Amino acid sequence: MNVGSNEEAETLRHLFGVRWPLVVRYVEWLSTAGLERGLIGPAEVDRLWERHIANCAALAPLIPVDQRVIDVGSGAGLPGIVLALARPDLEVLLIEAMSRRTAFLREVVADLGLRDVTVENSRAENVACTAPVVTARAVAPLPRLVKNVAHLLEPGGVLLALKGARVWQEVHAAEHLLAKLGYQPGVEVLTVRAVAGQLTVQRDADASNDRRWATVVRVIKQ
């Protein structure tokens, strides 16, 4: 398991700053207890940094300062714990429906000393609180996701969903649902890349995977 290319390592170290040792410890959690408890597949252990940590860290520059964030379907803490490590100014609520995953999250949060991170064992549909930012990764296709989290977003709040190769198919399938669910019209597709040790964000960028860390869908609540 390695951090990836020199540029990826430089960018990650810059992003996490003094919390870098905590990120390393979190990766150790994922590759040991996370693997043993079935939260991380065996094939993922050697690519945790580039496929998971870097991918989740790409959300960090998209969130304004001092925000409350609800991370739905947190699983092993991706992206919620990564965000909390990269952005200590954020207050993060991790929502996870499976008890064994919730137990793992609570152990990790306690071990890393993340005081502004709370874990709730619940389905997103049953959560009553709201936040200006909701994040999601590998939770559901976009049409179902925008429906399940609409009640969690404050007016003007933003849903940030990490997506893969089928992003445009999901966007087209979800667009007709936005108005009836209380979202603003239109979906933004953002590409986050590492350039010269910094993360850059482009809107509707080309499909090239060169230096791409993540593809993020951004939807805004009315």
From Swiss-Prot:
Q: Which InterPro entries match?
A: rRNA_ssu_MeTfrase_G (IPR003682), SAM-dependent_MTases_sf (IPR029063)
| Molecular function terms from GO | rRNA (guanine-N7-)-methyltransferase activity
**Enzyme Commission designation:** 2.1.1.-
The cross-references to Gene3D superfamilies, in alphabetical order and at most eight, read: Vaccinia Virus protein VP39 (3.40.50.150)
As for subcellular location, the record says:
Cytoplasm
Gene Ontology cellular component? cytosol
Query: Where do the annotations place S-adenosyl-L-methionine binding?
Result: G73, L78, A124, E125, R137
Record bears the keyword Glycoprotein = no
- Keyword entries, A-Z: Cytoplasm, Methyltransferase, rRNA processing, S-adenosyl-L-methionine, Transferase
Q: Which HAMAP family match?
A: 16SrRNA_methyltr_G
Q: Which family does it belong to?
A: Belongs to the methyltransferase superfamily. RNA methyltransferase RsmG family.
Concerning PANTHER family, the annotation shows: S-ADENOSYL-L-METHIONINE-DEPENDENT METHYLTRANSFERASES SUPERFAMILY PROTEIN
What task does this protein carry out?
Specifically methylates the N7 position of guanine in position 518 of 16S rRNA.
What protein name does the entry list?
Ribosomal RNA small subunit methyltransferase G
Q: What is the lineage of its organism?
A: Bacteria, Bacillati, Actinomycetota, Actinomycetes, Acidothermales
